[in-house]
Amino acid sequence: MDKLNLSHAGFKAYDIRGIVPDEVNEELAYRVGRAYADLYYPKTMCIGYDVRPSSQKICEAASRGLTDGGADVYNIGRCGTEMMYFGTFFYKMDGGFMIAASHNPSNYNGIKIVRQEGIPVSEDTGLKAVSYTHLTLPTT
């Protein structure tokens, strides 16, 4: 796994985004997944990823973090962000992760997190807690 300079650098108001691999990489994805699971105890999580070259590996790492934290992860594969929202809502999952970086160039990637019913997680509703918790986890 890529090593990470542990910080809050990639954490934005509504998601996590940054340059791959300097700010967003497999290590960060694992730690975010594990931190989310440790904080919110989800039983089921939906996860998907976009077409960026780094997305599948980042998705797999986030899935491992969620699984190691006790969640059952349903990987819906390559998809649009709306499909992760739909899967989380329709299948009554406890939350969802989407590996994507919106309009940013292909050397960027990120993680968008939603709670039950596809409700976005933002800085004020849990992302800040994930940001601090990921720093307390042991390095892998």
For each predicted feature, which ranges?
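Ferredoxin-reductase
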Residues: 41-117
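Glycine-rich phosphate-binding loop plus the immediately following alpha-helix
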Residues: 120-132
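An N-terminal, well-structured beta->alpha segment
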Residues: 1-64, 68-69
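Conserved small/polar residues in nucleotide/adenosyl-binding loops
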Residues: 133-139
